[in-house]
Every structure is written in C-alpha cells, then in structure tokens.
C-alpha cells in the first residue's frame, strides 16, 4: 500500500532533504524513523524509500512538505503519525498520514508549490531569528522600496525561461517554469516574500530574493529584473541569498487525491503571510 505523509521540519540541522553518504539529511532521518516503526522484518521484505514533493536545500525549512512511500504494513492513520514521530528528533514532525492510490506521487502529482521567505532587516541581528530568517543590515532610518520591488515582480509572472536564477548544480531538465503569484509583505523590521509556481529551479527562490533586495535598496531599478530575466545568464543576477529564511509552505494536488492542507498556523509566521 502507498502512504502519504505531511511533515514540517527545521532545516537548520540538516544537509538538505536528499539522502547523502556521511551527511545528516531529512530524508535519512525520516526513512530511519519509518523503518524503526514498521520493524526490521517488514523492511527486509520492502525497504522504506520516500519520494518527496520538494527536495529542500541545506538550511531550508518546510511547513507543508509531502512525501509518499510504499509498504506492506497496515496501520491506522494516526498510528502512523504517533508511531513515526516517536522515532524522530524534535526538528521533524509528521502532521498527518493517509493511504493514497498507486497513482499518487508526492513529486509528480503536485501542480503548485508555494514558498515563503522571511527576512529580518535592521542595524542588528535578532538572536531570536537565528536560522529562522534571513538577515540584511540596514541603517535605522532606512527601509525597502516595496512598490519598486512589487513592480519588478510583474515581469516574472507567467511562463518564462528562468536560467538567470538557476544554480550551476541544478538538475532540472528545463529552465522553463511558471510563476503564478509573487507577494511582498512589509512588517518592519520584517519582510516576507510569498512565491507560488508550478515548480522551481535549484536556488531559484533565493536568487530572486537577492535581486528583489537589490531593487528594494535602490541599487537597481525595477526594470532591472526584466533585463536579468531576458539575459538568461546567471552571472548578471544578484548573488544567492542565504537559506535561513526559506520555507516550503504548501504543495497543491488535484482534489481527487484529497491531500490535507498543511498546518501553517502552527508556525511563527504572521497570519497575514500564511493565512491566504
């Protein structure tokens, strides 16, 4: 049978999602926990291999990650939640579990993904935001030009070649992606970016955030974003911004799979950011 799980995690202790030899990853920890719960004998018959909706990078967090795996073990839905959580560290939690059809794939059945980037900006870092938000030093009297940033985002909506925002390590078969929404929310000294699309390239969100911040500080004009997009050249875009503030917030699937909504309100992010 196929089981889908919804999970949240603090990505700061991990070297990203994907299994790596001699590295602590979310996938490693999750598969060990599931294997411990189902038992050694069941794993010999059918080893636990998880498929995820989004392979987050080192330090990136998740509020609404979705995975699936196949197993011969049958349990009640809440038994999966309680049982697997008992083998997980406090930085990872399963919120829900449910059996799904063999047609469901956590990765390929998804048609929308939404990320949130949280930034703290000001003259001093906040220790309370350590690893939970990005940081940019700004003088006390300075703030971002939100209107210029939002205007620069207009050229990104729709289907485009996002090669200028793609890392050299990206394994995607195509740089063509579709962005449906970009919203920039200012709550000084906090700044939030909500970006929704069908899929994203490696480092794409962090590279976009880096460009937005250049525009917001007046170092580039709002027209610069369109120039970067059209160039299809990573070298002319802003440097990749830090991972700390990036959250995989939500994965959307066709209604036929009845995948539960993520528990966004359990996060520290304000309702204005997550409540839409």
Swiss-Prot record:
User: Which segments cross the bilayer?
Assistant: none
**Disulfide linkage:** none
Recorded hits in SUPFAM superfamilies, A to Z, give: Pseudouridine synthase
Q: Which UniProt keywords apply?
A: Isomerase, tRNA processing
The UniProt entry annotates the active site at: 57 (nucleophile)
Q: Name one GO biological process term.
A: tRNA pseudouridine synthesis
Instruction: Offer an example of a GO molecular function term for this protein.
Output: tRNA pseudouridine(38-40) synthase activity
Q: Where does substrate bind?
A: 115
Q: What is its EC number?
A: 5.4.99.12
Q: Establish whether keyword DNA-binding is in the entry.
A: no
Q: Which reaction does it catalyse?
A: uridine(38/39/40) in tRNA = pseudouridine(38/39/40) in tRNA
**Group of enzyme by EC:** isomerase
Looking up InterPro entries in the UniProt record yields:
PsdUridine_synth_cat_dom_sf, PsdUridine_synth_TruA, PsdUridine_synth_TruA_a/b_dom, PsdUridine_synth_TruA_C, TruA/RsuA/RluB/E/F_N
Tell me which family the UniProt entry assigns to this protein.
Belongs to the tRNA pseudouridine synthase TruA family.
Q: Please name the NCBIfam families in this protein's record.
A: hisT_truA
Role played: Formation of pseudouridine at positions 38, 39 and 40 in the anticodon stem and loop of transfer RNAs.
Q: How does it assemble?
A: Homodimer.
Protein name, please? tRNA pseudouridine synthase A
Query: What is the organism of origin for this protein?
Result: Polynucleobacter necessarius subsp. necessarius (strain STIR1)
